[in-house]
A protein has these predicted regions:
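Histidine/acidic-rich helix-loop-helix segments that form or flank divalent-metal centers
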Residues: 48-54, 95-128, 133-141, 146-176
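Acidic/His-rich, divalent-metal-binding segments that scaffold phosphate/diphosphate chemistry
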Residues: 1-96, 107, 113-119, 137, ...
Length: 176
């Protein structure tokens, strides 16, 4: 009997997710690529794991009615899909330690003060990468508009926004 290797499971899951709703086709892949560019100076093993988590970070959306709201740049109170994604990450994947990153990927920076520093940082990176992908995919506006929208320290960590800006200058993230 041949078993499916763990590295193939993420590919199978992401391809399956892409068939369910066309608005999220390859969204996880683009968020992962944006995160990788933002985290260029972090340990490669951690970046790899975070990118795998990013591929499936919105898995919980397929279980909710939030899909129409999460594809907009401005998201308000879209927690349900994050909770389902968190539970999936914690219980079904080898990324249990990153489950809170998925849980908080729509949380404002000011709400994360009690969390571990690393969780806060990676959740903000995923949040900003997620918002950037929605902006690039669904809004036909200049990149400067994105940076203006992200210029809100209560919601977005300025150091994380600076990472996005540098990555975008280096790589033209809109083209991902």
């Amino acid at each position: 009997m041949t078993l499916i290797h763990a590295d193939k499971i993420i590919d199978i899951v992401t391809r399956s997710m892409n068939y369910i709703d066309s608005r999220l086709v390859d969204h996880g892949k683009r968020v992962a690529l944006i995160m990788a560019e933002m985290l260029w100076d972090q340990p490669a093993a951690m970046v790899s794991r975070l990118c795998a988590a990013a591929l499936i970070h919105d898995m919980g959306a397929y279980r909710t009615e939030e899909l129409n709201r999460i594809v907009r740049f401005e998201t308000e109170e879209v927690w349900e899909h994050s909770v389902y994604g968190y539970l999936f990450m914690r219980e079904v994947t080898p990324f249990r330690d990153l489950a809170k990153v998925v849980l908080y990927h729509h949380a404002e920076r000011s709400r994360l003060e009690r969390e571990d520093k690393q969780i806060r940082f990676y959740a903000q990176v995923m949040c900003v990468a997620d918002r950037a992908d929605c902006f690039f995919t669904f809004e036909n506006k200049a990149d400067e508009i994105l940076m203006q929208r992200l210029d809100c320290p209560e919601k977005f960590d300025p150091a994380v926004v600076a990472r996005l800006k540098k990555a975008n200058e280096r790589c033209r993230l809109r083209e991902y």
